Amino acid sequence: MPPADSNITDLIVASCADRPDAPVYAVRNGAGGWVDVHFTAFLTQVRAVAAGLIAHGVQPGDRVGLFSPTSYAWAVLDQAVWFAGAVSVPIYETSSAHQVEHIVTDSGLRVVAVGSEELGERVAEAAGHAGVDVATFPLTDAGLAELAEAGAFVSDDAVEHARSLATLASPASIVYTSGTTGRPKGAVITHGNFVGAAINVLHFAREVVQWSPETTTSRTLLFLPLAHVLAHAVQVICLYARIQVAHSGSPATLLDDLASFH
């Protein structure tokens, strides 16, 4: 395992240093195809969004909610939360206002990124019932661009300081169950949990992600909700291993996405 005072972002930064030109994500180009996002470009965007979070008052250890369908923007914000030293709290997009209220109060959420106006209204209803103030911002490409613009005055050193504060024992994410059999239950996933999963899957179960040290052509299409801990972990593992990931955010587009991203 890496040093105890390191965290999952150190593993990601080191992987990027090894292959900065690796295509780690693919996004739709609007014409039925996909465009590569290379590692350096991805981390540049992550750092800019992390600066935006810091500019909006997010402090190390704060909880940041992600309430949105599976998407590239989700992947960017997830890493940006960690680069800001904060803790991600994924929320299933199917969660009711009552379930969101429980997650807000249980985790201490004060800011939530939402994938749609309707999800934002659900957060507002939940916060109103809970009697707490919860800020929201859109978890979209445009929303992330606005966040990055807001962080333009935050120095690279400030982001790097925030990024380096967490250790392997620090919380990285609070993952909640879907709530189908009762109140959603939260489990704290540490930076060490994600680091251990990334290293051990590649070492002992590399066939899970079709990875080998000799190839950089493996690709994964993620369609599970990223609020699900398996999908969340697979995304982190793939980024560390430089396995290219694309996202399918709706069952309606899944077959087309599978056919075009292969």
Stretch-by-stretch model annotation:
Residues V195-R219, L224-H262:
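Conserved AMP-binding/adenylation subdomain of ANL enzymes
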Residues A4, V24-Q79, S96-E101, T105, ...:
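Conserved AMP-binding/adenylate-forming core of the ANL superfamily
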Residues P20-P23, A152-Y176, G182-R183, V209-R219:
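Conserved pre-ATP/AMP-binding loop-to-beta segment of ANL
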Residues A31, E118-L168:
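ANL superfamily adenylate-forming
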Residues V64, V81, V112, P171, ...:
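Conserved S/T- and glycine-rich ATP-binding loop of Class I adenylate-forming
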Residues D106-G108, A130, S260-H262:
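Active-site charged/polar residues at nucleotide-handling catalytic sites that mediate phosphoryl
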Residues D36-T40, A172-I199:
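Conserved AMP-binding A3 loop
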Residues G65-F67, W74, D78, W82-A113, ...:
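Short beta-strand->loop structural element characteristic of the AMP-binding/adenylate-forming
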